[in-house]
């Protein structure tokens, strides 16, 4: 009696299939907050602490980058996580009537 691995090998050989064992790392994306003239600094810090789980000091530093440089990097994530975090930022901003924008760009 053949074990499962042998059965799969024989099946693959009959169909002339070659398998490659290549594991690729997922693409990573930077999540970026953009400055505007209406969103308060306190709200940006709250977003960074709530959604991105940043400690207060780091959240404040990122908020100051957003304020002074026009944008700040919140973190680097896989596509699905980055998309979810962006949607959460936009939802929370909308709920609080702020025009805060967030985007991602591939690392």
Curated annotation (Swiss-Prot):
It holds the Pfam family ClpS. GO terms for biological process: protein catabolic process; proteolysis. Belongs to the ClpS family. Involved in the modulation of the specificity of the ClpAP-mediated ATP-dependent protein degradation. NCBIfam families: PRK00033.1-5. PANTHER family: ATP-DEPENDENT CLP PROTEASE ADAPTER PROTEIN CLPS, ATP-DEPENDENT CLP PROTEASE ADAPTER PROTEIN CLPS1, CHLOROPLASTIC. Binds to the N-terminal domain of the chaperone ClpA. This is ATP-dependent Clp protease adapter protein ClpS. It comes from Syntrophus aciditrophicus (strain SB).
């Amino acid at each position: 009696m053949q074990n499962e691995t042998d059965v799969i090998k024989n099946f693959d050989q009959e169909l002339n299939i070659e398998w490659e064992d290549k594991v690729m790392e997922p693409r990573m994306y930077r999540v970026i907050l953009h400055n505007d003239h209406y969103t308060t600094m306190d709200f940006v810090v709250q977003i960074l602490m709530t959604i991105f789980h940043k400690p207060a000091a780091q959240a404040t530093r990122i908020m100051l980058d957003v304020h002074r440089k026009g944008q700040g990097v919140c973190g680097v994530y896989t596509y699905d996580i980055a998309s979810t975090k962006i949607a959460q930022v936009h939802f929370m901003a909308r709920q609080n009537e702020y025009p805060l924008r967030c985007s991602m760009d591939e690392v």
